[in-house]
A protein has these predicted regions:
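Beta-strand elements of well-folded, non-transmembrane domains
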Residues: 14-16, 27-29, 63
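A short tyrosine-centered beta-strand micro-motif
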Residues: 17-23
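Hydrophobic residues positioned within well-ordered beta-strands of beta-sheet architectures
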Residues: 10, 21, 57-59
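Solvent-exposed, conformationally flexible loop/turn segments
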Residues: 16, 47-56, 64
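Short, surface-exposed beta-strand/strand-loop-strand elements in extracellular ectodomains
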Residues: 10-11, 25-46
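Short beta-strands within extracellular/lumenal beta-sheet-rich domains
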Residues: 2-17
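Serine-esterase "nucleophile elbow" of acetyl-processing enzymes
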Residues: 81, 85-146
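Noncatalytic modules at the cell exterior or secretory-pathway interfaces
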Residues: 63-85
């Protein structure tokens, strides 16, 4: 799905650790939305909501404040959420610390967190499998990508 609008960005400053995040999205018209976290990691993709409907999306985030990205280091300041949607909606988020296992992944450019320009176009934006990986886990595990 392509998104023309800038994403709604929610930032919650927290120390390093693992957190359960619940994002509640309420549609004011028929919408399709995608939730990304941290460095564009997919947490929920192409969720449909009808006008007046709400959806709670719960996922886990591992916060590590120092990541190497090519030759640069990226400072992550807590839980970072982007909600991509071209329709009219409101969103709330709740962040709570949790004590759960974390899967650490590393690898080459096929794993790494790739940046994207907006408007978002899935056909012309690269994405490592490490960015898609977290959406396939339930709320009992977190994924930390150090590729």
């Amino acid at each position: 799905m392509n998104y023309e609008k800038e994403p709604l960005h929610i930032s919650t400053p927290v120390p390093n650790g693992t957190y359960e995040v619940t994002v509640t999205v309420t549609a004011h018209e028929d919408i399709v939305f995608t939730i990304l976290s941290q460095s564009r990691r997919f947490m929920a993709q192409d969720i449909n909501l009808g006008k007046g409907e709400s959806s709670d999306i719960t996922f886990n985030v591992s916060v590590c404040d120092y990541h190497k990205n090519n030759e640069d280091y990226t400072n992550v300041n807590g839980v970072e959420i982007d909600i991509m949607c071209d329709g009219d909606f409101t969103a709330l988020s709740a962040v709570s610390p949790v004590n759960i296992p974390t899967v650490y992944i590393a690898g080459d450019s096929t794993v790494t967190d790739q940046p994207a320009e907006y408007p978002y176009n899935a056909a012309s934006t690269y994405c490592g499998w490490g960015q898609m990986f977290p959406q396939f886990f339930n709320t009992g595990i977190a994924v930390e990508n150090h590729a």
